[in-house]
Every structure is written in structure tokens, then in C-alpha cells.
């Protein structure tokens, strides 16, 4: 990764991802995270705001002058905040229903960065009984076909995938086998997506199983940390060439305890330029 980025930054590039669950309501913790963790790029999911109302000013005050957004009123929405110039490449509607769940950009060095918010899929893991579950599976299948076309292109795919694939990605594999996000059919679908471009799971590259690794804890828990019933729903996947430049990855569990928290936490990978 060289060229423009190397000329204008340090010798590393830090990219973070966070389902923020309303960017306007949680702008205080967004700016706190940006100030403390100092990512060069932050991808947000579930921004819940139309493009014209997106809060640019506090982000630009911190140096994030390049903002690409694909928003929707009160629901869904994705955004990419960057100190590095970005060119929007695409925004796909993998449900054909107008929901704002994806935006892709290209960095000056040619790296493609794809930010996605996969549907949660409702509560019942049955396509016939729960149309939302079928929509989720179809969304992932369409992503899989799209992913096949990315072979040979340096790409980082990040976001809330709403699937925790491994046993050590959930607090209880046995109890969650029939719970949407960890069912075998979802895990198999995500596996096909990963195989479509030989994606490298950066979280598990640096924190290999069976080590515990979570990015989400329900609001329903009175004490989320004590109960620790977490799941790893958020992911950063890289094409092999990009993964080879990754030097570190971390999740920020302390953010779950901040004032007005999201139920998700940020994750960040650092790359050598």
C-alpha cells in the first residue's frame, strides 16, 4: 500500500468499523472513539439518518474531511469517515427493497473498502415462517455472487454481518444453535461467502479460536459485562494480499460501558503501508 497514502500519512493505516445504532444520538461516543483510537478511516453501520441530515461538522472538526454516506431515515444506513481521500465505487441493494445497507469506496492506492450491514433476520430461523430470515439468507447469497467478482482486487470487507460463525464467537454454542445469528444454515451461508473470495477473517487471524471474541452484547442484560453473553457479529475480512499487510487487530470492549452506548463495539485493524 503506497502512493498517495504513504506520502500523506505515517507508515500505517488504521481502519475501524462500528455499528453505532444511530450516529446522531451517539455522536459523543463516535467523536470520543475517533479522538482516542485515532483510526484513519471509520466505517459505520446503522446510522439511521438520511444523507442531508448527516452530522458532518463534528467529524470534520477532527480531521475526517472525506465522508461517504448511504443513509435512510430512522433505519439502516452506512457511512465511511476518512482522513484519506475516497472515491465512491458502488452501493448495492442486495434485497431490491431500497434499504441502505452497503457502500463501497476506493482509496488512492487502489484498495477497495466495502462497508455492509447485513439484515438481522428476525427471531425465527425458518424461511417459511419468517420472511425476514429468508431475506437475510438471500442477501448473503447475492453478496456471495458479487464477492466472486472481486478476485484479484485488493479489498477489505467490513461491517455488521449479523452472523457469529464459530463456537467461540458466542457465549454458548449449544444454547444458540437455534437462535438467529448462530444457526447452522447462517453459518454455512457465511462460509460460502468467505470461500467466494478466499477472504481472510482478520479478527480470527489475530485472536485465533478457541479464544473468546465478541463484538455485541444485548441491551437486555442488566450488567452486560458480568453476564458476558456476547456474540461476534461484526467482522473485518481482507483479500489475501491486503491481509498480508495487516499488523494488528483489536476490539474495544470498554466502549460498551460508555454513556449511551451502542450494543456493538468498534473493531480496528492496522495495516503496514
Question: What does each of the following model-derived ranges do?
Answer:
Residues 88-93, 166-273:
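Metal-dependent phosphoester-hydrolase catalytic domains
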Residues 119-140, 174-179:
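Surface-exposed cleft-lining segments at the edges of enzyme active sites
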Residues 22-26, 97, 131-142, 182-186, ...:
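Soluble or luminal CAZymes and related metallo-dependent hydrolases
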Residues 47-125:
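Structured beta-strand-rich core segments of catalytic domains in phosphoester-bond hydrolases
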Residues 1-62, 68, 75-78, 193, ...:
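N-terminal, active-site-proximal structural segment of metallo-dependent hydrolase catalytic domains
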Residues 29-32, 41, 96-99, 112, ...:
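Glycosyltransferase catalytic domains, chiefly GT-A lineage
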Residues 15-19, 30, 34-52, 113, ...:
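Active-site beta-strand/loop signature of hydrolases that rely on acidic residues for catalysis
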